[in-house]
Structures are given as structure tokens and as C-alpha cells.
Amino acid sequence: MSVWTSDQAFSWYNEQGWLVGCNFLPSSCINQIEMFQEDTFNIEDITKEISLAKGIGFNTLRVYLHDLLWKEKDQFLIRFNDFLDCCKRFEIKPIIVLFDDCHYPFPETDNDNHQIIQ
């Protein structure tokens, strides 16, 4: 792999267009753990809401991935790929924030995640 020149990087950036979007979490989830864990992952809700985002002119969505999701590595990656496929279908460029664990000091991967952040 070669390093791009400043001109190559600038050219690539100019081809991307203006990014318009938001932080994304489906309405059926309380946090990023619920978005991707097995019991609460809902691709139908995700698809509907990504379609709505595209419909109002968004072209990017930022998604946070909690480090606890890697406990279900293989299954998590399947669900994550489903999410990426959905983004691709609607021409949404996801911005992925890796290993975000700052939302709650004692996170768990169970269905009792509905803690209020204090």
C-alpha cells in the first residue's frame, strides 16, 4: 500500500460531497449495546429508520460500537454486516466509532440495560 500525496487526498475528499447526518440509534434501543446484541437487534427497525434518514436528505450516520459487543464476536459481526448492508442499500456512509464505553460506568450485555445516565 502506498501513501497518498496531499493532492491525491484532497482530490478524494472533494469527491465525497458534503456529509449530512446524525448520531444513529434505532428508536427501539436505549444504547449502542442494545442496537447490536442478539436479543434486541432489529434489522426491520434499522432499515425503516435508515430509509427515513435517507428520505430527509442524510447521507451519513454515526454509530458507536461498545467494546462489550465483541463478547459475541461472530454473531455480532453478522449483525454489524447486516447494518452495513442496509446503509449501502440506502447510500448512507456510516461513521463507526470503535470501542466506545463511556456512556455508563458499569455496562452489561443483558436486557436490564435501561439505566439512566447520571
Q: Where in the sequence are the language-model features?
A:
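Active-site mouth of glycoside hydrolases
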Residues: 1-118
